[in-house]
Amino acid sequence: LGKVVITSHDYSGFIVNRILMPMINEAFFALYTGVACKEDIDTGMKLGTNHPMGPFELADFIGLDVCLSIMRVLHAGLGDNKYAPCPLLVQYVDAGRLGRKRGIGVYEYSKDPRSTKSSSRL
């Protein structure tokens, strides 16, 4: 199958979600507080971390509703406010902006997969 096995103790979020989701959540806080625009946050993270997608591109791919659900599980399971979902993430999900699967999340997606437009901040 070409898979690599990793092991983790039984903790909320295990390994990947426990590290990845707070990064995505922090990107939402950076946008929410006006640190930078979404395009610059994504570009900075791609260039600065050598990731193939920025945090907003990845969140839209995963689904903003899924990201929010995981943040809520982490917050409840670990009891640490650093896992509290950003209000902007909650606002996007409440507005039905769920990401690629809905055609709009942080970015707007046309039916042509080569075309991605920036959408204004809620």
Name every feature range the model reports, one short phrase each.
Residues L20-E26:
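Structural/interface elements that position substrates and couple domains in central-metabolism enzymes
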